[in-house]
Amino acid sequence: MINFAARNRKMDMEKSYKAALFDLDGVVFDTESQYSIFWGSECRRYLPEEDGLEHKIKGQTLVQIYEKHFSGELEKERENITKRLYKFEAQMSFEYVPGFEQFISSLRQQGLKTALVTSSNKMKMEAVYRKHPEFTTFFDAILTSEDFSESKPSPDCYFRAAERLSLDNGDCVVFEDSFNGLRSGRAAGMTVVGLSTTNSKEDIAPLCDIVINDYIGFNI
């Protein structure tokens, strides 16, 4: 179990946890800035009137992005966007957020269960596995967009992760970076640790129990 000392007045003082649930981009890998470049280009091409859309869609599945923003006349462009996205992801740099490998290894040594809960699909994950063959050894469960019907900020993905691990929601702590992801963890009734890899500490603080820059020096 994790036992968090008091780091924020909103947290339970000495609550123990049995599982840690991690988002992928901006939480495990420092990749959100790369996606901002890709989706910024696509949004300016097709939806120039929606300023900053590339930031608002973070945490959403590709299906949800298409349904909400690329429908009607833009539906015919989905195939081309998808092809460009997969080509982009195949060339992406997947660098771990500083301290992540040591942190999650420590959790597992303590007997905690760990799960990846990402809006990315299985094809994206195949690119991750090719670049990081060790990746699957970090997690007891990996949930992708194919495993849940509602995307973040819905709590559905985290409900399913807790169920997969045979744990109660309150036994889990969530690590997230995007506004949609943070809201998802909060709506699931879980303790939420926010990483300021994508948004500022000040902006994400209202949605978190703890805010950290990365995993370096984050002791349990």
PLM regions with names:
Residues M1-N3, F94:
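Short intrinsically disordered, low-complexity coil segments enriched in acidic
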Residues N3-K18, S105, N121-I220:
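Asp-based, Mg2+/Mn2+-dependent phosphohydrolase catalytic module
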Residues K15-Q110, E126:
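N-terminal helical cap/lid subdomain that shapes the substrate entry/recognition surface
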Residues V27, T118-S120:
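Conserved phosphate-coupling serine/threonine residues in phosphotransfer and NTP-handling enzymes
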Residues A90-E95, S119, A188-G189:
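Short, flexible loop segments at the rims of nucleotide/cofactor-binding pockets, characterized by
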Residues Q110-L112, M190:
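Short phosphate-binding/catalytic loops that engage adenosine nucleotides
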